[in-house]
Amino acid sequence: MTDFTREQVRIPAGADTDLDCWQYLPSSPAPHPTVVMAHGIGGVKAAGLAPFAEFFADNGFAALVFDYRHWGRSGGSPRELLSIRRQREDYRTALAWARRHDSLDNDRLFIWGTSFAGMHILDIAASDPALAGAIAQCPLVDGPAGMGKVPAPRALRLTATAVADLLGGVTGKPPKYLPLSVGPDSLGVIATDDALTGLHRLSPDDGEPWPNRITARSLLDIAVHRPVRAAGRIRCPLLMVVAESDTMAPTGPATQAAARAPRGELYRSRGGHYDVYAGGLDHTDVLRVELEFLTRHAARA
């Protein structure tokens, strides 16, 4: 029997669209310490985030889990566009909504992000001193380092498609899409040995739409962003969950971020990038470590 409720809410975002969110509220007395959560590159909330939010809610933490604009059930056109600026804005929109909610505790507000969302976690934590803490899980925090893992011939083909899509967008042409998760011999954004394992592990089982694609122009945004450089300005507690055998997100920059942040903490999870999720090698221990971090810092806030 669960000890929480889940409600779907929609939060206005930008001039003409909104964010589709799940709000988890524990049965304990309000106001609740709260975790604002979102997925990584191409991810939607139905793709593996519920087990984390449910575990937190079962242990007394509210959770606000949202789809970025252009993704999942949130609004925005074109579909499957990744904009770092807009995704940061979406986190801030969700945080602002949480701060206005009577059932959520302003003084115990955390942000949580997985994979590519590690970029946003460092950026936002460095600019929002009111946060009680931040968690970045199997995080990508250095775009050039991430792109450096892509073999040169494949990187050239991806870049050419991205530039063509960007120029086409300027002239009003429909977006060019790239596959997101593919096998190592195919052309796609994530072409690691475990990419298809991750795709299958995270695929929603409730019919939630999750196209395995991304607008090609999105890669140009990713390639140059380096929020690891902001780690030294983060004043809130920061937990970096870094997978020991991550083949997608470079572990060096993530480990450096934990060391540079004045209140940084590091947990090295067993296995690869997708082993932090339900069904993965270290999912249970990752839940335990993240809850301990949240509980400890919620008590001090």
Q: What does each of the following model-derived ranges do?
A:
Residues I234, M240-V242:
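Short beta-strand/loop motif that positions the catalytic acidic residue
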Residues G42-E54, Y68, G252:
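The serine-hydrolase catalytic nucleophile loop
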Residues M1-P29, A278:
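N-terminal cap/lid segment of alpha/beta-hydrolase-fold proteins
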Residues G14, K45-G48, W71-N106, F110, ...:
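Catalytic nucleophile-loop/oxyanion-hole region of alpha/beta-hydrolase
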Residues F55-G75:
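Conserved alpha/beta-hydrolase
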Residues L122-L202:
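Alpha/beta-hydrolase-fold enzymes
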Residues S269-A301:
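Catalytic active-site module of serine/aspartate enzymes centered on a nucleophile-bearing elbow/loop
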Residues T247-P253:
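Conserved alpha/beta-hydrolase "acid-adjacent" motif
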